[in-house]
Swiss-Prot record:
Its main location: membrane. Residues 1-24 form the signal peptide. It is found in: Membrane. Keywords: Membrane, Signal, Transmembrane, Transmembrane helix. Disulfide bonds: none annotated. It comes from Oryza sativa subsp. japonica (Rice). This is 5'-adenylylsulfate reductase-like 6. InterPro entries: APRL5/7, Thioredoxin-like_sf, Thioredoxin_domain. Residues 49-165 form the Thioredoxin domain. It is a single-pass membrane protein. The chain crosses the membrane at residues 205-225. The lineage of its organism: Eukaryota, Viridiplantae, Streptophyta, Embryophyta, Tracheophyta. One of its GO terms (cellular component) is membrane. It comes from the Eukaryota.
Length: 300
């Protein structure tokens, strides 16, 4: 009886599906922490596994600080720190900022800081060798490195790897920057504004346009002058200019024919007569006012 019952049980065990060997052999340490863990355990596990977990490409934007905080951050620290110096008015800085945020996400072990031009004194900028915007500084202990060359994501990743010896945890890829849209809006604002506002907002552009106009004038003025001289020699050299000479003689006789002193004296006399009439009317009104005031007082 027992043998009859064991036979179907053994058959069912043999036919049951087995787990795949890949899933059984998967190491637990390569997995990202789940939310079912306690909060403090999940936070500690995430911090420990973030460098090795390539599937967790989280966005980690750079921290905004000012110049004084930057000096405190870089003084006497051995950890690697990357600093972006940028200007909000610069279109190249607007393009560089999302790339720097991507680098912060790809290299979470490196602390990324961002300093805007207006938040740092010129002494701080000159101290860290900032000559233009955008500029990147990589500080590793007592040493500092300035990436020179292309500011594309691929070249900066190579610089990070060469300087710090760290590999990116994930490759996010270059972002698409709407340069055409930003440039078109800036051009529309520039054309809609007045000339004074355009000069205040874009002084370098105004000086460059003036320089180009002067260069064009210097380049084409000799040719233009030679053309005018040739036209004058060809068409107006043999023209009868006696009419112009007679006209100048007539204009010279006008001051002698018209006595300007008499006209000026008549104008002065007419102005004096008008002033005397005004004074007489004002004195009469004042006298009438003095006579009427006691009457008003008596009536009251």
């Amino acid at each position: 009886m027992a043998a009859r019952l064991l036979a179907p049980l053994l058959l069912l065990l043999l036919l049951a599906p087995l787990p795949p060997p890949a899933a059984a052999a998967e190491p637990e340490e390569a997995r990202c922490p789940r939310e079912r863990l306690p909060p403090f355990v999940a936070a500690a596990a995430a911090a420990a596994l973030r460098p090795s977990c390539r599937a967790s490409a989280e966005r980690c934007p750079a921290e905004e600080i000012n110049g004084e905080e930057l000096v405190k951050e870089l003084s006497g620290k051995e950890e690697c720190t990357a600093v972006l110096f940028y200007a909000s008015w610069c279109p190249f800085s607007q393009r560089m900022r999302p790339v720097f945020d991507d680098l912060s996400s790809m290299f979470p072990r490196i602390k990324h800081l961002a300093v805007e031009q207006t938040n740092a004194m010129p002494a701080v900028l000159s101290r860290y060798g900032v000559r233009s915007f955008p500029s990147i500084l990589i500080a590793c202990g007592p040493y500092a490195y300035w990436p020179v060359g292309s500011k594309e994501l691929d070249s900066l990743v190579n610089v990070y790897t060469a300087v710090t010896g760290q590999e990116p945890i994930a490759y996010l890829g270059p972002r698409k920057w709407s340069a055409a849209r930003t440039g078109s809006t800036q051009h529309v604002k520039l054309w809609k504004s007045s000339i004074i506002e355009a000069l205040k907002s874009e002084p370098y552009l105004a000086f460059s346009i003036l320089f180009i106009c002067l260069k064009i004038l210097v380049a084409f003025f000799p040719k233009f002058f030679s053309c005018i001289k040739g036209i004058w020699v060809q068409y107006f050299r043999h023209a009868n200019l006696g009419i112009l000479a007679k006209l100048t003689q007539l204009l010279e006789c006008v001051p002698h024919a018209v006595d300007l002193r008499k006209i000026w004296s008549k104008c002065r006399l007419m102005g004096g007569a008008m002033n005397s009439r005004v004074w007489a009317s004002s004195l009469a009104s004042m006298s009438f006012g003095e006579r009427s005031s006691p009457r008003a007082a008596v009536l009251d």
